[in-house]
């Protein structure tokens, strides 16, 4: 039995004393103990070594004590498993030496055997669950098919992802074939994560906001919703679309347990657009953690007042930044725990 199930209660829409809190990228570069391991091991070694991934996952639980842990991994382990080479380059970030630019390229990409290619993730989950000792729930995650597609076609991060969008518009059959392969792989991957022991999953649609509302339905939401439908009976599913406020209405009608919101959408608008019945997660501007601690606490309390304490998970509107002082991150978590006291 979980000692702290506040997060799962909020996902079910149950009444709570206070909302739960965790932070995207909470196992990250703002923690000195994370930096120590980063300096010793390269990025994918940390992802692919269960002992390292588990240790990194529990670091923030010890240090700042959020109400949920999120497995340390990366969305790009999925395309790696599908036969796409992915490197992590200094000062560039994700880099794909042979991006996908044709139907022939798409046909070389395959839906893998998950245990064979991503078994190390399942081992990390089992190890993390042991280390957490039922203190808090564990979240597993995956990138949205569109977000994975963006990297696979563009070959690296981009301000506009015009190659990826251009591929959709000029070669829609190939684009949809690739998106479906990514979707099928992601469903199998998340199902294995649930079997391995995660308590909830989150889909990160980091680049969904690059698309117009019409294109979003065709190239992103259609595929995310397949994942939601496939997982909803097995585990709570959170969908986080950065910059996707325009899709909250459609998302709110889905079987997702919660929707993540970024800081460009007010609590009032998010509640209104999503239909008012679904749990929302967010949406503190990560840069605001650079504010003085009393300001952070005041703003967090105001944010909870705006969203309401029920059907709400306190989080940032995107991942925590590397330059945030640890005591500021802790103040964010503490502010939620002090709410209403």
UniProtKB/Swiss-Prot annotation:
Top-rank taxon, per record: Bacteria
Keyword field: Cytoplasm, Decarboxylase, Lyase, Porphyrin biosynthesis
Major subcellular location class: cytoplasm
Binding site for substrate: 25-29, 44, 74, 151, 206, 318
Known EC number: 4.1.1.37
CDD domains documented for this protein: URO-D (cd00717)
A GO term, aspect molecular function: uroporphyrinogen decarboxylase activity
Location in the cell: Cytoplasm
Enzyme category, top tier: lyase
Catalysed reaction, written as an equation: uroporphyrinogen III + 4 H(+) = coproporphyrinogen III + 4 CO2
UniProt-annotated site: Transition state stabilizer, residues: 74
Biological process (GO), any one: protoporphyrinogen IX biosynthetic process
Pathway(s) the chain acts in: Porphyrin-containing compound metabolism; protoporphyrin-IX biosynthesis; coproporphyrinogen-III from 5-aminolevulinate: step 4/4
One cellular component term from this protein's GO annotations in UniProt: cytosol
Assembly, per entry: Homodimer.
Cited function: Catalyzes the decarboxylation of four acetate groups of uroporphyrinogen-III to yield coproporphyrinogen-III.
Family from the record: Belongs to the uroporphyrinogen decarboxylase family.
Name the UniProt record assigns to this protein: Uroporphyrinogen decarboxylase
Organism this protein belongs to: Flavobacterium johnsoniae (strain ATCC 17061 / DSM 2064 / JCM 8514 / BCRC 14874 / CCUG 350202 / NBRC 14942 / NCIMB 11054 / UW101) (Cytophaga johnsonae)
Lineage: Bacteria, Pseudomonadati, Bacteroidota, Flavobacteriia, Flavobacteriales
């Amino acid at each position: 039995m979980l000692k702290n199930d506040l997060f799962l209660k909020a996902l079910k829409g149950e009444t709570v004393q206070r909302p739960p809190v965790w932070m995207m990228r909470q196992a990250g570069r703002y923690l000195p103990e994370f930096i120590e391991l980063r300096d010793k091991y390269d990025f994918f070694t940390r992802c692919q070594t269960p002992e390292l991934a588990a240790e990194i996952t529990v670091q923030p639980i010890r240090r700042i004590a959020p109400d949920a842990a999120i497995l340390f991994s990366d969305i790009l382990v999925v395309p790696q498993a599908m036969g796409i080479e992915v490197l992590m380059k200094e000062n560039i970030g994700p880099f794909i030496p042979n991006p996908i630019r044709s139907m022939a390229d798409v046909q070389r990409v395959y839906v893998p055997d998950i245990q064979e290619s991503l078994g190390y993730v399942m081992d990390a989950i089992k190890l993390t669950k042991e280390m957490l000792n039922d203190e808090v729930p564990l979240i597993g995650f995956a990138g949205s098919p569109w977000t994975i597609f963006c990297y696979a076609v563009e070959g690296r991060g981009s301000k506009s992802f015009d190659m990826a969008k251009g591929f959709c518009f000029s070669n829609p059959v190939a684009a949809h074939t690739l998106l479906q392969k990514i979707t099928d792989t992601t469903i199998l991957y998340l199902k294995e994560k649930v079997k391995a022991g995660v308590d909830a999953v989150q889909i990160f649609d980091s680049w969904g906001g690059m698309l117009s509302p019409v294109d979003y339905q065709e190239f992103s939401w259609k595929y995310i919703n397949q994942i939601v439908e496939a997982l909803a009976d097995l585990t709570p599913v959170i969908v986080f679309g950065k910059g996707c406020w325009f899709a909250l209405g459609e998302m709110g009608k889905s079987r997702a347990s919660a929707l993540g919101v970024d800081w460009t959408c007010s609590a009032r608008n998010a509640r209104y657009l999503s239909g008012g019945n679904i749990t929302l997660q967010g949406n503190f501007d990560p840069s605001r953690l650079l504010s003085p601690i009393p300001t952070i606490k005041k703003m967090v309390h105001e944010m909870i007042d705006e969203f309401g304490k029920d059907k709400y998970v306190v989080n940032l509107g995107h991942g925590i930044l590397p330059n945030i002082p640890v005591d500021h991150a802790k103040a964010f978590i503490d502010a939620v725990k002090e709410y209403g006291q």
